[in-house]
Amino acid sequence: MATLGPMNTKVTTTHLYNHRDLREQAMIMLKEVRAIDGVEALSEQFVRGLAEPGLGHTHYTVSVDGRIIGLGATDGETSELAVHPAHRRQGIGRELIDALPTDGVWAHGDLPPAQALASSLGLNKTRELLVMAVEGDALREAAVYDNPAGITNSSLKTAPGTRDEVEGKWLKANNEAFHWHPEQGGWDRNRLTRAQSATWFRETDVLFLWDGDELVGFHWVKKHSDELQEIYVVGLAEAYRGKGLGDPLVRLGLRHMVNGGARRVILYVEADNDSAVAAYEKLGFTVAERHVVYEK
């Protein structure tokens, strides 16, 4: 391990997936941050990176009395960090940002402490991701699904063709829909396989619309619990955009979630994706959280 920064707040560079005791400390701290802030400090991918060497993440820790009270993580392109609420306004966030190698740092929730730190460092907000949510009567109304004429639907488990063929069509539609997206675009078979290794993944929660044997689009659901579920990824193949099929594709997944017991559904969407935000607002979704990237 290498040590960076002044002696009063040492920032240690490490790989937590190689150190079980430190990883457990980090997870405890993240739970305490969640309890106080009301939002997760690290995204799902970065939490997985604490334990999975294959993701190739590097970690930066600050400890007091043998206990981690500050954590940074990077995948080489972007970074995330957390400071325990009891140790904020002590320069720890500044030290972590100085140690992180990327220009962009996520602030999940864009809470006042993060805004204050960004302002003090002269960081600029360059990206904003919205968490939108729907529940109650609005959710039940949004979950009304009418199958478009000439279109069929299936799950990944019941899709026509071999698994290899279906996943190839799924990847093609994904990369057409998200060619512009920094995390969701440019997927290959290995990336899809890693995504399916998540503990929450179920074949029955990946839904498809079909035009014969052509994939129209997909709706991937993430089940946090019976009551709380998520539109994880939804996308249309290029050939089927602009044909009014986006709305039924979203409703197909919402019906699936409501039938599975969902009482609240969330999704993540780029704040500057005006058409998508408007479509979700039309279905009854409202903004619940904001996540931003600040850049040096």
Curated annotation (Swiss-Prot):
Which positions in this protein are listed as binding acetyl-CoA 2?
A: 234-236, 241-247
Catalyzed reactions: 1D-myo-inositol 2-(L-cysteinylamino)-2-deoxy-alpha-D-glucopyranoside + acetyl-CoA = mycothiol + CoA + H(+)
Binding of acetyl-CoA 1 occurs at 81-83
Q: Where is the N-acetyltransferase domain?
A: 17-146, 156-296
Q: Give UniProt keywords alphabetically.
A: Acyltransferase, Repeat, Transferase
One function term, GO molecular function aspect: mycothiol synthase activity
Q: Where does 1D-myo-inositol 2-(L-cysteinylamino)-2-deoxy-alpha-D-glucopyranoside bind?
A: 44, 183, 222, 230, 268
Q: Which Pfam families match?
A: Acetyltransf_1, Acetyltransf_7
Indicate the segments annotated as coiled coil, or none if absent: none
Which major enzyme category is it? Answer: transferase
Query: EC number(s) per UniProt?
Result: 2.3.1.189
Keyword Acyltransferase recorded:
yes
Biological process GO annotation list? mycothiol biosynthetic process
Superkingdom, taxonomy of origin: Bacteria
Q: Describe the protein's quaternary organization and the partners it interacts with.
A: Monomer.
What family is reported?
Answer: Belongs to the acetyltransferase family. MshD subfamily.
Q: What does this protein do?
A: Catalyzes the transfer of acetyl from acetyl-CoA to desacetylmycothiol (Cys-GlcN-Ins) to form mycothiol.
State the protein's name. Answer: Mycothiol acetyltransferase
Source species: Corynebacterium efficiens (strain DSM 44549 / YS-314 / AJ 12310 / JCM 11189 / NBRC 100395)
